[in-house]
Protein backbone atom coordinates (compact mmCIF):
# COMPACT_ATOMS: atom_id res chain seq x y z
CA UNK A 1 0.00 0.00 0.00
CA UNK A 2 1.43 3.36 -1.05
CA UNK A 3 0.24 6.11 1.30
CA UNK A 4 -0.34 9.71 0.16
CA UNK A 5 2.68 11.98 0.63
CA UNK A 6 0.67 14.42 2.75
CA UNK A 7 -2.28 13.59 5.01
CA UNK A 8 -4.17 16.40 6.71
CA UNK A 9 -6.38 15.99 9.77
CA UNK A 10 -8.65 18.88 10.75
CA UNK A 11 -11.40 19.20 13.33
CA UNK A 12 -12.46 20.93 16.55
CA UNK A 13 -10.61 20.83 19.87
CA UNK A 14 -10.84 17.52 21.70
CA UNK A 15 -11.90 15.45 18.69
CA UNK A 16 -8.77 13.32 18.97
CA UNK A 17 -6.79 14.82 16.09
CA UNK A 18 -3.40 14.75 17.81
CA UNK A 19 -3.77 11.16 18.97
CA UNK A 20 -4.90 10.02 15.52
CA UNK A 21 -2.14 11.98 13.83
CA UNK A 22 0.59 10.57 16.06
CA UNK A 23 -0.61 6.97 15.70
CA UNK A 24 -1.07 7.28 11.95
CA UNK A 25 2.33 8.90 11.46
CA UNK A 26 3.99 6.15 13.48
CA UNK A 27 2.15 3.49 11.47
CA UNK A 28 3.26 5.02 8.16
CA UNK A 29 6.73 6.13 9.24
CA UNK A 30 5.79 9.77 8.61
CA UNK A 31 6.54 13.01 10.43
CA UNK A 32 3.77 14.00 12.86
CA UNK A 33 3.15 17.76 12.82
CA UNK A 34 0.44 19.18 15.08
CA UNK A 35 0.14 22.70 13.68
CA UNK A 36 -2.12 23.82 16.51
CA UNK A 37 0.78 23.83 18.95
CA UNK A 38 2.26 26.75 17.01
CA UNK A 39 -0.81 28.85 17.84
CA UNK A 40 -0.78 27.64 21.43
CA UNK A 41 2.90 28.52 21.71
CA UNK A 42 2.09 32.01 20.47
CA UNK A 43 -0.78 32.32 22.95
CA UNK A 44 1.55 31.23 25.76
CA UNK A 45 4.06 33.89 24.71
CA UNK A 46 1.30 36.51 24.56
CA UNK A 47 0.32 35.70 28.15
CA UNK A 48 3.88 35.77 29.43
CA UNK A 49 4.63 38.96 27.54
CA UNK A 50 1.55 40.70 28.99
CA UNK A 51 0.38 41.48 25.44
CA UNK A 52 -3.26 42.19 24.70
CA UNK A 53 -4.44 39.20 22.62
CA UNK A 54 -6.84 41.52 20.79
CA UNK A 55 -3.94 43.70 19.57
CA UNK A 56 -3.37 42.17 16.16
CA UNK A 57 -0.33 44.29 15.33
CA UNK A 58 1.48 43.39 18.56
CA UNK A 59 0.57 39.71 18.33
CA UNK A 60 1.71 39.54 14.70
CA UNK A 61 5.04 41.18 15.55
CA UNK A 62 5.53 38.63 18.31
CA UNK A 63 4.65 35.76 15.95
CA UNK A 64 7.30 36.89 13.49
CA UNK A 65 9.98 37.12 16.19
CA UNK A 66 9.28 33.89 18.08
CA UNK A 67 11.47 30.84 17.61
CA UNK A 68 8.95 27.97 17.81
CA UNK A 69 10.28 24.43 17.47
CA UNK A 70 8.17 21.27 17.38
CA UNK A 71 10.40 18.26 18.03
CA UNK A 72 10.01 14.51 18.63
CA UNK A 73 9.39 13.64 22.32
CA UNK A 74 12.88 12.21 22.70
CA UNK A 75 13.47 10.53 26.05
CA UNK A 76 10.55 12.26 27.82
CA UNK A 77 8.48 9.73 29.77
CA UNK A 78 5.47 11.91 30.60
CA UNK A 79 3.18 10.82 27.77
CA UNK A 80 3.89 13.75 25.44
CA UNK A 81 3.53 13.30 21.67
CA UNK A 82 6.11 15.99 20.88
CA UNK A 83 8.25 18.62 22.58
CA UNK A 84 7.52 22.31 21.98
CA UNK A 85 10.22 24.90 22.57
CA UNK A 86 9.58 28.65 22.56
CA UNK A 87 12.85 30.55 22.34
CA UNK A 88 14.53 27.45 23.74
CA UNK A 89 12.11 26.96 26.67
CA UNK A 90 10.17 23.69 26.96
CA UNK A 91 6.51 24.72 27.22
CA UNK A 92 4.94 21.46 26.04
CA UNK A 93 2.52 20.88 28.89
CA UNK A 94 1.92 24.55 29.63
CA UNK A 95 0.23 24.84 26.25
CA UNK A 96 -2.79 22.93 27.64
CA UNK A 97 -3.31 25.36 30.52
CA UNK A 98 -6.86 26.81 30.61
CA UNK A 99 -5.48 30.36 30.33
CA UNK A 100 -3.83 29.42 27.02
CA UNK A 101 -7.02 27.65 25.92
CA UNK A 102 -9.08 30.78 26.52
CA UNK A 103 -7.01 33.11 24.33
CA UNK A 104 -5.60 30.84 21.62
CA UNK A 105 -8.54 31.47 19.29
CA UNK A 106 -8.31 35.23 19.89
CA UNK A 107 -4.62 35.39 19.00
CA UNK A 108 -5.04 33.01 16.06
CA UNK A 109 -7.90 34.84 14.39
CA UNK A 110 -5.79 37.85 13.39
CA UNK A 111 -5.32 37.48 9.60
CA UNK A 112 -1.66 38.52 9.63
CA UNK A 113 -0.90 36.00 12.39
CA UNK A 114 -2.46 33.18 10.39
CA UNK A 115 -0.47 34.25 7.34
CA UNK A 116 2.79 33.99 9.30
CA UNK A 117 1.89 30.61 10.74
CA UNK A 118 0.57 29.16 7.50
CA UNK A 119 3.79 30.01 5.69
CA UNK A 120 5.76 28.07 8.30
CA UNK A 121 3.32 25.16 8.20
CA UNK A 122 3.27 25.03 4.40
CA UNK A 123 7.06 24.88 4.27
CA UNK A 124 7.05 21.80 6.50
CA UNK A 125 4.19 20.13 4.62
CA UNK A 126 5.85 20.64 1.25
CA UNK A 127 8.62 18.23 2.27
CA UNK A 128 6.16 15.32 2.08
CA UNK A 129 5.80 12.15 4.17
CA UNK A 130 3.96 14.09 6.84
CA UNK A 131 0.70 13.89 8.78
CA UNK A 132 -0.44 17.45 9.51
CA UNK A 133 -3.02 18.15 12.19
CA UNK A 134 -4.90 21.42 12.67
CA UNK A 135 -8.09 23.31 11.90
CA UNK A 136 -7.59 24.66 8.39
CA UNK A 137 -4.82 22.46 7.00
CA UNK A 138 -6.81 20.65 4.33
CA UNK A 139 -8.89 23.68 3.39
CA UNK A 140 -6.26 26.45 3.35
CA UNK A 141 -2.70 25.46 4.28
CA UNK A 142 -2.41 22.35 2.08
CA UNK A 143 -5.47 22.44 -0.21
CA UNK A 144 -3.83 20.06 -2.70
CA UNK A 145 -3.11 17.35 -0.12
CA UNK A 146 -4.08 13.98 -1.60
CA UNK A 147 -5.89 12.78 1.55
CA UNK A 148 -7.83 15.03 3.92
CA UNK A 149 -9.53 13.83 7.09
CA UNK A 150 -12.03 15.85 9.13
CA UNK A 151 -12.31 14.34 12.61
CA UNK A 152 -15.24 15.36 14.78
CA UNK A 153 -17.01 14.32 17.99
CA UNK A 154 -19.86 15.58 20.15
CA UNK A 155 -19.13 18.44 22.54
CA UNK A 156 -19.70 16.17 25.55
CA UNK A 157 -17.25 13.57 24.25
CA UNK A 158 -14.63 16.20 23.47
CA UNK A 159 -14.93 17.89 26.87
CA UNK A 160 -14.68 14.54 28.65
CA UNK A 161 -11.52 13.64 26.71
CA UNK A 162 -9.84 16.94 27.48
CA UNK A 163 -10.78 16.66 31.17
CA UNK A 164 -9.39 13.13 31.37
CA UNK A 165 -6.19 14.26 29.65
CA UNK A 166 -5.58 16.99 32.23
CA UNK A 167 -6.42 14.72 35.17
CA UNK A 168 -4.05 12.01 33.91
CA UNK A 169 -1.25 14.58 34.10
CA UNK A 170 -2.16 15.36 37.70
CA UNK A 171 -3.75 18.73 36.91
CA UNK A 172 -7.03 20.25 38.07
CA UNK A 173 -9.89 20.14 35.58
CA UNK A 174 -13.52 21.17 35.75
CA UNK A 175 -15.62 19.38 33.13
CA UNK A 176 -18.27 22.08 32.82
CA UNK A 177 -15.71 24.86 32.54
CA UNK A 178 -13.81 22.97 29.85
CA UNK A 179 -17.07 22.28 28.01
CA UNK A 180 -18.02 25.97 28.09
CA UNK A 181 -14.54 26.99 26.88
CA UNK A 182 -14.84 24.56 23.97
CA UNK A 183 -18.24 25.92 22.97
CA UNK A 184 -16.84 29.44 23.01
CA UNK A 185 -13.79 28.42 21.02
CA UNK A 186 -15.93 26.57 18.47
CA UNK A 187 -17.85 29.79 17.93
CA UNK A 188 -14.66 31.79 17.43
CA UNK A 189 -13.17 29.18 15.08
CA UNK A 190 -16.25 28.42 13.00
CA UNK A 191 -14.92 30.29 9.96
CA UNK A 192 -11.56 28.51 9.88
CA UNK A 193 -12.42 24.99 11.02
CA UNK A 194 -14.98 23.96 8.40
CA UNK A 195 -14.01 20.75 6.58
CA UNK A 196 -12.56 20.92 3.09
CA UNK A 197 -15.07 20.01 0.40
CA UNK A 198 -13.15 16.83 -0.46
CA UNK A 199 -12.39 15.76 3.13
CA UNK A 200 -13.39 12.38 4.52
CA UNK A 201 -15.40 13.03 7.71
CA UNK A 202 -15.08 10.66 10.68
CA UNK A 203 -17.19 10.97 13.84
CA UNK A 204 -15.11 9.52 16.67
CA UNK A 205 -17.72 9.20 19.45
CA UNK A 206 -17.44 5.75 21.00
CA UNK A 207 -14.40 4.80 18.93
CA UNK A 208 -10.97 3.99 20.31
CA UNK A 209 -7.93 5.68 18.74
CA UNK A 210 -6.98 2.36 17.14
CA UNK A 211 -10.43 2.05 15.56
CA UNK A 212 -10.15 5.53 14.06
CA UNK A 213 -6.69 4.71 12.68
CA UNK A 214 -8.15 1.57 11.10
CA UNK A 215 -10.80 3.68 9.35
CA UNK A 216 -8.14 5.99 7.91
CA UNK A 217 -5.96 3.07 6.79
CA UNK A 218 -9.00 1.59 5.06
CA UNK A 219 -9.55 4.91 3.33
CA UNK A 220 -5.93 4.91 2.13
CA UNK A 221 -6.36 1.36 0.82
CA UNK A 222 -9.54 2.39 -1.04
CA UNK A 223 -7.67 5.26 -2.66
CA UNK A 224 -4.90 2.92 -3.76
CA UNK A 225 -7.44 0.50 -5.27
CA UNK A 226 -9.16 3.37 -7.12
CA UNK A 227 -5.81 4.56 -8.44
CA UNK A 228 -4.88 1.10 -9.69
CA UNK A 229 -8.24 0.72 -11.44
CA UNK A 230 -7.78 4.11 -13.12
CA UNK A 231 -4.39 3.02 -14.47
CA UNK A 232 -5.67 -0.35 -15.70
Swiss-Prot record:
Top EC category: transferase
Location(s) in or outside the cell: Cytoplasm
Predominant location: cytoplasm
Transmembrane segments annotated in the record for this chain: none
Disulfide bond residue pairs: none
Binding-site residues for ATP, renumbered to this chain: 11-19
Reaction catalysed by this enzyme: CMP + ATP = CDP + ADP; dCMP + ATP = dCDP + ADP
GO biological process terms on file: pyrimidine nucleotide metabolic process
EC annotation from Swiss-Prot or TrEMBL: 2.7.4.25
GO CC annotation terms, alphabetical: cytoplasm
Name this protein carries in UniProt: Cytidylate kinase
Source organism of the structure: Roseiflexus castenholzii (strain DSM 13941 / HLO8)
Lineage of producing organism: Bacteria, Bacillati, Chloroflexota, Chloroflexia, Chloroflexales
